[in-house]
């Protein structure tokens, strides 16, 4: 993975979350994990293509997702309805769009694909060789984990 992708991805992510949540976002410690270590109730991936191949995986627990949906829509969600899942996918899309623009501004060439949800089994069988940089972000809605997985073409 090219490390120069990580900083613009994280800066863009923090800006989007700050804008959406209107509160301070704190970054936890960066760690290198394997796909099978992603563990949460919800995971949404935005695949990236171009100079490198990979994706941004945003994962979180159920309560965090519901809290984010409440903030983003102004409605009170009590269950992970299709609208709630679409809201989390849209947040992931906003993160990926801003991050891709920031990386492309550095002279790289990336495009994003539409978001898709993943099961833990799909993560484990999709690319067992993949290295993932995981960064926990602490928000007023709960912990969101940003996972960056890229392979140079």
Can you describe what each PLM-predicted range is?
Residues 1-153:
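N-terminal auxiliary interaction/assembly segments of multi-subunit proteins
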């Amino acid at each position: 993975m090219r490390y120069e992708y990580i900083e613009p991805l994280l800066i863009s992510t923090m800006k989007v979350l700050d804008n959406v949540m209107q509160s301070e976002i704190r970054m936890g410690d960066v760690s290198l994990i394997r796909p099978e270590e992603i563990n949460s109730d919800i995971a949404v991936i935005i695949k990236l293509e171009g100079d490198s191949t990979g994706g941004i995986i945003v994962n979180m627990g159920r309560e965090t997702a519901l809290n984010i949906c409440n903030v983003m829509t102004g409605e009170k969600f009590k269950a992970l309805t299709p609208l709630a899942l679409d809201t989390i996918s849209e947040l992931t899309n906003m993160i990926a769009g801003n991050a891709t623009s920031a990386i492309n501004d550095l002279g790289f060439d990336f495009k994003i694909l539409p978001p898709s949800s993943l099961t833990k089994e799909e993560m484990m069988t999709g690319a067992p060789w993949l290295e993932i940089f995981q960064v926990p972000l602490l928000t007023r809605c709960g912990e969101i984990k940003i996972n960056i997985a890229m392979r140079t073409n």
